[in-house]
Amino acid sequence: NNGRFKETEIQYSADGHTFTKLIDKDFQGSATAGKVTFDQTIQAKSFRFIVKSGSGDGQGFASCAEMEFFAKNPVNFDYSTLFTDASCSELKTGITEDDIAQCEYPFFKNIAYYMIKGKYPAEFRISEFKAYPNPDIQSETHKTNPYSQLDNPTGISVKAGENLIVLVGDTHGYDIGLRVQNLDAPENDGFGGVTYLLNQGINKLTISEQGLVYVMYVTKTLDDPAAAPVKIHFASGKVNGYFDSQNPEHNGRWSELLNKATNRYFDVLGKYAHLTFETSDLRTYTGSKGDELIDLYDKIVYSEQQLLGLEKYDKMFRNRMYLNVMYKSYMYATAYHTAYNRTTMNEICSPEK
Protein backbone atom coordinates (compact mmCIF):
# COMPACT_ATOMS: atom_id res chain seq x y z
CA ASN A 1 0.00 0.00 0.00
CA ASN A 2 3.01 2.31 -0.10
CA GLY A 3 3.74 4.99 -2.67
CA ARG A 4 0.28 6.22 -3.67
CA PHE A 5 0.26 9.73 -5.14
CA LYS A 6 -1.94 12.51 -3.83
CA GLU A 7 -1.04 16.10 -4.78
CA THR A 8 1.44 16.37 -7.64
CA GLU A 9 2.86 18.97 -9.99
CA ILE A 10 3.56 17.77 -13.54
CA GLN A 11 6.25 19.47 -15.60
CA TYR A 12 7.60 18.89 -19.10
CA SER A 13 10.81 19.68 -20.92
CA ALA A 14 11.12 20.27 -24.65
CA ASP A 15 14.91 20.01 -24.60
CA GLY A 16 15.45 17.56 -21.75
CA HIS A 17 16.98 20.23 -19.49
CA THR A 18 14.60 23.11 -18.79
CA PHE A 19 11.26 22.14 -17.24
CA THR A 20 8.00 24.08 -17.41
CA LYS A 21 4.98 23.54 -15.18
CA LEU A 22 2.14 21.90 -17.08
CA ILE A 23 -0.58 21.05 -14.58
CA ASP A 24 -1.40 20.28 -10.93
CA LYS A 25 -3.06 16.90 -10.38
CA ASP A 26 -4.47 15.32 -7.21
CA PHE A 27 -4.51 11.52 -7.53
CA GLN A 28 -6.26 11.31 -4.12
CA GLY A 29 -4.07 8.45 -2.89
CA SER A 30 -5.98 5.98 -5.03
CA ALA A 31 -4.63 2.45 -5.48
CA THR A 32 -6.09 2.29 -8.99
CA ALA A 33 -4.54 3.73 -12.12
CA GLY A 34 -4.91 7.47 -12.62
CA LYS A 35 -5.34 9.53 -15.78
CA VAL A 36 -4.11 12.99 -16.74
CA THR A 37 -5.61 14.68 -19.81
CA PHE A 38 -3.73 17.47 -21.57
CA ASP A 39 -5.74 20.18 -23.30
CA GLN A 40 -3.39 20.12 -26.28
CA THR A 41 -0.63 17.96 -27.71
CA ILE A 42 2.68 18.35 -25.88
CA GLN A 43 5.97 17.86 -27.73
CA ALA A 44 8.38 16.87 -24.97
CA LYS A 45 11.59 14.95 -24.44
CA SER A 46 10.81 14.28 -20.79
CA PHE A 47 8.24 14.78 -18.04
CA ARG A 48 8.78 15.32 -14.33
CA PHE A 49 6.41 14.54 -11.48
CA ILE A 50 6.82 16.43 -8.20
CA VAL A 51 4.91 14.43 -5.58
CA LYS A 52 3.85 16.81 -2.81
CA SER A 53 1.79 14.37 -0.73
CA GLY A 54 0.89 10.71 -0.70
CA SER A 55 -0.72 7.88 1.24
CA GLY A 56 0.14 4.35 2.24
CA ASP A 57 1.39 2.27 5.13
CA GLY A 58 4.87 3.77 5.20
CA GLN A 59 4.15 7.42 4.26
CA GLY A 60 6.87 9.34 2.50
CA PHE A 61 7.19 6.90 -0.39
CA ALA A 62 6.31 7.66 -4.01
CA SER A 63 6.07 4.77 -6.45
CA CYS A 64 4.77 4.41 -10.01
CA ALA A 65 4.91 0.93 -11.53
CA GLU A 66 4.01 2.00 -15.06
CA MET A 67 3.36 5.22 -16.99
CA GLU A 68 2.07 5.42 -20.56
CA PHE A 69 1.34 8.22 -23.02
CA PHE A 70 -1.41 8.12 -25.63
CA ALA A 71 -2.84 10.25 -28.41
CA LYS A 72 -6.54 10.26 -29.23
CA ASN A 73 -7.51 8.52 -32.44
CA PRO A 74 -8.53 11.31 -34.86
CA VAL A 75 -10.45 8.85 -37.05
CA ASN A 76 -13.25 7.44 -34.95
CA PHE A 77 -16.88 6.44 -35.22
CA ASP A 78 -19.28 9.33 -34.55
CA TYR A 79 -21.88 7.81 -32.23
CA SER A 80 -24.34 10.65 -32.87
CA THR A 81 -25.03 9.37 -36.39
CA LEU A 82 -27.02 6.44 -34.96
CA PHE A 83 -27.12 6.46 -31.16
CA THR A 84 -28.43 8.76 -28.44
CA ASP A 85 -25.18 8.94 -26.45
CA ALA A 86 -21.57 7.75 -26.33
CA SER A 87 -22.51 4.42 -24.74
CA CYS A 88 -24.22 3.44 -28.02
CA SER A 89 -26.90 1.74 -25.95
CA GLU A 90 -29.99 3.15 -27.67
CA LEU A 91 -30.83 4.17 -31.22
CA LYS A 92 -31.88 7.74 -31.90
CA THR A 93 -35.55 8.32 -32.59
CA GLY A 94 -36.32 7.97 -36.28
CA ILE A 95 -33.31 5.84 -37.24
CA THR A 96 -34.17 3.47 -40.08
CA GLU A 97 -32.54 0.38 -41.56
CA ASP A 98 -31.45 2.55 -44.49
CA ASP A 99 -29.61 4.85 -42.06
CA ILE A 100 -27.89 1.85 -40.51
CA ALA A 101 -26.93 0.47 -43.93
CA GLN A 102 -25.02 3.70 -44.65
CA CYS A 103 -22.80 3.28 -41.58
CA GLU A 104 -19.19 2.65 -42.64
CA TYR A 105 -18.21 0.91 -39.41
CA PRO A 106 -19.28 -2.78 -39.49
CA PHE A 107 -18.96 -3.24 -35.73
CA PHE A 108 -21.42 -0.44 -34.92
CA LYS A 109 -23.61 -1.24 -37.91
CA ASN A 110 -24.10 -4.74 -36.49
CA ILE A 111 -25.02 -3.42 -33.03
CA ALA A 112 -27.51 -0.95 -34.52
CA TYR A 113 -29.07 -3.60 -36.73
CA TYR A 114 -29.69 -5.96 -33.81
CA MET A 115 -31.14 -3.08 -31.80
CA ILE A 116 -33.58 -1.98 -34.48
CA LYS A 117 -34.75 -5.59 -34.75
CA GLY A 118 -35.20 -5.76 -30.96
CA LYS A 119 -32.74 -8.64 -30.70
CA TYR A 120 -29.71 -7.05 -29.06
CA PRO A 121 -28.70 -9.01 -25.89
CA ALA A 122 -28.62 -5.98 -23.58
CA GLU A 123 -28.77 -7.70 -20.18
CA PHE A 124 -25.39 -7.34 -18.42
CA ARG A 125 -23.92 -5.79 -21.57
CA ILE A 126 -25.62 -2.43 -20.99
CA SER A 127 -25.93 -1.19 -17.41
CA GLU A 128 -25.84 1.95 -15.31
CA PHE A 129 -23.25 1.94 -12.53
CA LYS A 130 -23.53 4.05 -9.38
CA ALA A 131 -20.60 5.60 -7.55
CA TYR A 132 -19.37 4.18 -4.26
CA PRO A 133 -17.20 6.01 -1.73
CA ASN A 134 -13.60 4.97 -1.39
CA PRO A 135 -13.68 2.32 1.38
CA ASP A 136 -10.51 3.83 2.85
CA ILE A 137 -12.62 6.78 4.09
CA GLN A 138 -14.59 4.73 6.62
CA SER A 139 -11.60 2.50 7.30
CA GLU A 140 -9.90 5.56 8.77
CA THR A 141 -12.89 6.87 10.73
CA HIS A 142 -13.98 3.43 12.02
CA LYS A 143 -10.45 2.10 12.67
CA THR A 144 -11.05 -1.11 10.73
CA ASN A 145 -9.80 -2.78 7.57
CA PRO A 146 -11.44 -1.22 4.51
CA TYR A 147 -14.48 -2.92 3.01
CA SER A 148 -14.98 -3.83 -0.66
CA GLN A 149 -13.66 -2.06 -3.75
CA LEU A 150 -15.70 -4.35 -6.02
CA ASP A 151 -19.27 -3.18 -5.41
CA ASN A 152 -19.89 -2.85 -9.17
CA PRO A 153 -19.69 -6.28 -10.84
CA THR A 154 -20.55 -6.27 -14.53
CA GLY A 155 -21.43 -9.88 -15.24
CA ILE A 156 -18.83 -9.87 -18.03
CA SER A 157 -15.82 -12.20 -18.26
CA VAL A 158 -12.78 -11.79 -20.50
CA LYS A 159 -9.90 -13.90 -21.78
CA ALA A 160 -6.20 -13.05 -21.77
CA GLY A 161 -5.21 -11.30 -24.99
CA GLU A 162 -8.80 -10.40 -25.85
CA ASN A 163 -9.68 -6.96 -27.20
CA LEU A 164 -12.50 -5.70 -25.00
CA ILE A 165 -14.70 -2.96 -26.50
CA VAL A 166 -16.26 -0.76 -23.82
CA LEU A 167 -18.54 2.15 -24.75
CA VAL A 168 -18.87 4.71 -21.97
CA GLY A 169 -21.54 7.38 -21.60
CA ASP A 170 -21.26 10.66 -19.71
CA THR A 171 -18.68 10.26 -16.91
CA HIS A 172 -19.70 13.57 -15.28
CA GLY A 173 -16.02 14.47 -15.03
CA TYR A 174 -15.04 11.50 -12.85
CA ASP A 175 -12.32 8.92 -13.42
CA ILE A 176 -13.85 5.55 -14.29
CA GLY A 177 -11.95 2.29 -14.55
CA LEU A 178 -12.29 -1.45 -14.93
CA ARG A 179 -10.70 -4.13 -12.81
CA VAL A 180 -10.24 -7.64 -14.15
CA GLN A 181 -9.87 -10.14 -11.31
CA ASN A 182 -8.75 -13.73 -11.82
CA LEU A 183 -9.33 -15.82 -8.69
CA ASP A 184 -7.89 -18.90 -10.39
CA ALA A 185 -4.60 -18.83 -8.47
CA PRO A 186 -3.49 -22.35 -7.44
CA GLU A 187 -2.04 -22.45 -3.92
CA ASN A 188 -2.74 -18.74 -3.60
CA ASP A 189 -5.36 -15.99 -3.29
CA GLY A 190 -6.19 -14.37 -6.63
CA PHE A 191 -7.83 -11.30 -5.08
CA GLY A 192 -6.75 -8.06 -6.74
CA GLY A 193 -6.36 -7.98 -10.49
CA VAL A 194 -5.44 -5.53 -13.23
CA THR A 195 -7.01 -2.08 -13.57
CA TYR A 196 -7.73 -0.32 -16.89
CA LEU A 197 -8.73 3.30 -17.34
CA LEU A 198 -11.87 4.19 -19.27
CA ASN A 199 -12.61 7.33 -21.27
CA GLN A 200 -16.00 8.65 -22.28
CA GLY A 201 -16.79 7.14 -25.67
CA ILE A 202 -15.09 4.20 -27.35
CA ASN A 203 -12.49 2.19 -25.43
CA LYS A 204 -10.54 -0.71 -26.91
CA LEU A 205 -8.63 -2.54 -24.19
CA THR A 206 -6.15 -5.37 -24.68
CA ILE A 207 -6.71 -7.64 -21.70
CA SER A 208 -3.56 -9.05 -20.10
CA GLU A 209 -5.17 -11.69 -17.87
CA GLN A 210 -8.47 -13.54 -17.86
CA GLY A 211 -11.10 -12.90 -15.21
CA LEU A 212 -14.35 -11.25 -14.19
CA VAL A 213 -14.81 -7.54 -14.87
CA TYR A 214 -15.73 -4.90 -12.27
CA VAL A 215 -16.36 -1.18 -12.72
CA MET A 216 -14.28 1.12 -10.50
CA TYR A 217 -16.29 4.30 -9.89
CA VAL A 218 -15.12 5.72 -6.58
CA THR A 219 -15.68 9.06 -4.86
CA LYS A 220 -13.40 10.74 -2.33
CA THR A 221 -16.28 11.68 -0.01
CA LEU A 222 -19.09 9.61 1.49
CA ASP A 223 -21.75 11.73 -0.21
CA ASP A 224 -21.14 13.22 -3.63
CA PRO A 225 -24.39 14.29 -5.32
CA ALA A 226 -22.52 15.16 -8.52
CA ALA A 227 -21.44 11.54 -9.02
CA ALA A 228 -24.45 10.47 -11.10
CA PRO A 229 -24.73 6.93 -12.50
CA VAL A 230 -22.64 6.18 -15.58
CA LYS A 231 -24.01 4.08 -18.43
CA ILE A 232 -21.50 1.55 -19.77
CA HIS A 233 -21.92 -0.81 -22.71
CA PHE A 234 -19.73 -3.92 -22.95
CA ALA A 235 -19.93 -4.55 -26.68
CA SER A 236 -17.60 -7.55 -26.45
CA GLY A 237 -16.50 -9.97 -23.76
CA LYS A 238 -18.61 -12.91 -22.63
CA VAL A 239 -21.75 -12.63 -20.50
CA ASN A 240 -21.35 -14.57 -17.25
CA GLY A 241 -24.02 -12.77 -15.27
CA TYR A 242 -24.37 -12.32 -11.52
CA PHE A 243 -27.16 -12.39 -8.95
CA ASP A 244 -28.19 -9.33 -6.93
CA SER A 245 -30.85 -9.91 -4.29
CA GLN A 246 -31.50 -6.14 -4.19
CA ASN A 247 -32.24 -5.88 -7.91
CA PRO A 248 -35.97 -6.37 -8.64
CA GLU A 249 -35.07 -7.65 -12.11
CA HIS A 250 -33.31 -10.63 -10.49
CA ASN A 251 -36.25 -11.65 -8.27
CA GLY A 252 -36.95 -15.36 -8.65
CA ARG A 253 -34.09 -15.81 -11.13
CA TRP A 254 -31.35 -17.31 -8.95
CA SER A 255 -31.37 -20.74 -10.59
CA GLU A 256 -31.71 -19.28 -14.08
CA LEU A 257 -28.80 -16.87 -13.72
CA LEU A 258 -26.53 -19.39 -11.98
CA ASN A 259 -27.24 -22.06 -14.60
CA LYS A 260 -26.43 -19.60 -17.41
CA ALA A 261 -23.04 -18.72 -15.89
CA THR A 262 -20.14 -19.52 -18.22
CA ASN A 263 -17.16 -18.66 -16.00
CA ARG A 264 -15.56 -20.69 -13.23
CA TYR A 265 -16.59 -17.95 -10.77
CA PHE A 266 -19.90 -16.22 -10.05
CA ASP A 267 -20.78 -13.02 -8.16
CA VAL A 268 -23.60 -12.99 -5.61
CA LEU A 269 -24.63 -9.61 -4.18
CA GLY A 270 -26.79 -8.66 -1.24
CA LYS A 271 -27.36 -5.40 0.59
CA TYR A 272 -24.34 -5.78 2.87
CA ALA A 273 -22.35 -8.73 1.48
CA HIS A 274 -20.81 -9.74 -1.85
CA LEU A 275 -19.63 -13.29 -2.56
CA THR A 276 -17.42 -14.54 -5.39
CA PHE A 277 -17.22 -18.32 -5.22
CA GLU A 278 -16.79 -21.12 -7.73
CA THR A 279 -19.88 -21.57 -9.88
CA SER A 280 -19.78 -25.34 -9.45
CA ASP A 281 -19.76 -25.04 -5.64
CA LEU A 282 -22.76 -22.72 -5.68
CA ARG A 283 -24.59 -25.19 -7.90
CA THR A 284 -23.62 -28.14 -5.70
CA TYR A 285 -23.92 -26.79 -2.15
CA THR A 286 -26.35 -23.87 -2.54
CA GLY A 287 -28.64 -25.41 -5.13
CA SER A 288 -31.84 -23.42 -5.47
CA LYS A 289 -31.34 -21.53 -2.20
CA GLY A 290 -29.31 -18.58 -3.41
CA ASP A 291 -31.64 -16.02 -1.85
CA GLU A 292 -31.36 -17.76 1.51
CA LEU A 293 -27.57 -17.88 1.26
CA ILE A 294 -27.01 -14.20 0.53
CA ASP A 295 -29.69 -13.19 3.05
CA LEU A 296 -27.73 -15.07 5.74
CA TYR A 297 -24.50 -13.29 4.85
CA ASP A 298 -26.34 -9.97 4.81
CA LYS A 299 -27.65 -10.74 8.29
CA ILE A 300 -24.16 -11.58 9.57
CA VAL A 301 -22.61 -8.37 8.23
CA TYR A 302 -25.55 -6.24 9.36
CA SER A 303 -25.46 -7.77 12.86
CA GLU A 304 -21.73 -7.04 13.18
CA GLN A 305 -22.28 -3.39 12.33
CA GLN A 306 -25.32 -3.16 14.58
CA LEU A 307 -23.32 -4.63 17.49
CA LEU A 308 -20.66 -1.96 16.95
CA GLY A 309 -23.31 0.75 17.26
CA LEU A 310 -22.91 1.88 13.66
CA GLU A 311 -26.64 1.78 12.93
CA LYS A 312 -27.52 3.76 16.07
CA TYR A 313 -25.11 6.55 15.17
CA ASP A 314 -25.77 6.47 11.41
CA LYS A 315 -22.24 5.21 10.64
CA MET A 316 -23.08 2.07 8.67
CA PHE A 317 -20.49 1.10 6.06
CA ARG A 318 -21.33 2.35 2.57
CA ASN A 319 -19.45 -0.51 0.89
CA ARG A 320 -20.24 -4.19 1.11
CA MET A 321 -18.12 -6.81 2.81
CA TYR A 322 -16.43 -8.87 0.10
CA LEU A 323 -15.91 -12.63 0.45
CA ASN A 324 -13.91 -14.63 -2.10
CA VAL A 325 -12.70 -18.18 -2.53
CA MET A 326 -8.95 -18.85 -2.45
CA TYR A 327 -6.57 -21.81 -2.43
CA LYS A 328 -4.16 -21.29 0.48
CA SER A 329 -4.42 -21.06 4.28
CA TYR A 330 -7.90 -21.61 5.72
CA MET A 331 -9.89 -18.42 6.29
CA TYR A 332 -8.74 -14.88 6.96
CA ALA A 333 -9.86 -11.25 6.93
CA THR A 334 -7.69 -8.47 5.56
CA ALA A 335 -7.95 -5.17 3.69
CA TYR A 336 -10.83 -5.02 1.17
CA HIS A 337 -11.87 -8.67 1.49
CA THR A 338 -12.24 -11.83 3.53
CA ALA A 339 -11.00 -15.10 2.01
CA TYR A 340 -12.12 -18.72 2.33
CA ASN A 341 -10.31 -21.86 1.23
CA ARG A 342 -12.15 -23.89 -1.34
CA THR A 343 -12.12 -26.87 1.04
CA THR A 344 -14.63 -24.96 3.19
CA MET A 345 -17.19 -24.42 0.43
CA ASN A 346 -19.41 -27.32 1.49
CA GLU A 347 -20.20 -25.22 4.56
CA ILE A 348 -19.64 -21.69 3.28
CA CYS A 349 -22.05 -22.18 0.35
CA SER A 350 -24.73 -24.06 2.28
CA PRO A 351 -27.54 -22.07 3.93
CA GLU A 352 -28.15 -25.00 6.29
CA LYS A 353 -24.59 -25.06 7.63
Question: Which residues make up each language-model segment?
Answer:
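A mature extracytoplasmic/lumenal domain signature
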Residues: 40-42, 53, 170, 219, ...
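Long, contiguous interaction/targeting segments characteristic
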Residues: 71-91, 323, 347-353
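Catalytic cores of extracellular degradative/oxidative enzymes
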Residues: 255-257, 264-353
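Beta-strand-enriched, solvent-exposed domains that form extended recognition/catalytic surfaces
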Residues: 78-243
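Non-cytosolic beta-sandwich-type ligand-binding/adhesion modules
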Residues: 2-30, 174-196
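Aromatic, loop-rich ligand-recognition surfaces of beta-strand-rich domains
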Residues: 1-21, 30-79
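Exposed low-complexity, polar/acidic, P/S/T/G-rich flexible segments that act as propeptides
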Residues: 57-79, 219-265
